[in-house]
Amino acid sequence: MENAAFGTLCRLGRAVPRFIPALNRLSSAALSARSYTDASDRVFVTPRRVHFVESEYAVPRESLAGALTELRRAVPRLADPVMFPVEVRVAAADDIWLSTAYGRDTAYIAIHQYTGLPYRAYFDLFESVMAEVAGRPHWGKLHTLDAERLGPLYPRFGDFLRVRAETDPESRFGNAYLSKVFDQAG
C-alpha cells in the first residue's frame, strides 16, 4: 500500500484504536498477492515513510509455520490492537558465527507497531513465541535478550567472545548495548 495512504490509516488507528481491526481489513484488501524474483537490493529496499517500532527474529525454517500459527492465535488476546502486517522472508544457512542464519536454513519474522501505539506487550508476546523455537533476534532491532540468553542460541558465541576480548581488551569499541549482549556471559 502506498506510504501516504497507509500513513493516514495508521494515524487514524492511533487516534481511534477501536478502528484498527477494520483499518487492517481495508489495508489487506488493498494489498495484492504477488511473487517475484530479482536482486535483493531491488526486492528488499523500499521507501519507508510511515514510522514504526520493529522487532525481528530468525527461526529455523522448519519452525516457521508453527511460530506463525502461535503468533496468530495469541495476538487477538492482546489488549492493544496491532496496526502492521507481519513480514516473513527466508534465507539459506551460513557459517558466520553471529549471523542469525548460522548453521541453519532460516525464516525471518518481523513485527511492527505504528509509532505512538503501545507495543511492549506485543513485542514481549512475540519474544516468548520466538523463544519456543530457538529464535535469534536481529542484532539491530528491538529485543530484550542479554548475553546469558543469547549465548545458547549461537554455537560459536564463546569463540566470538574470546576473539573480541583478544582484539579489543579494553572495550574501546563497546557501548551499553554491546555490554548487554556480550559482557554478561558466564
Feature-to-residue mapping (PLM):
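Noncatalytic alpha-helical scaffold of FAD-dependent oxidoreductases
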Residues: 1-186
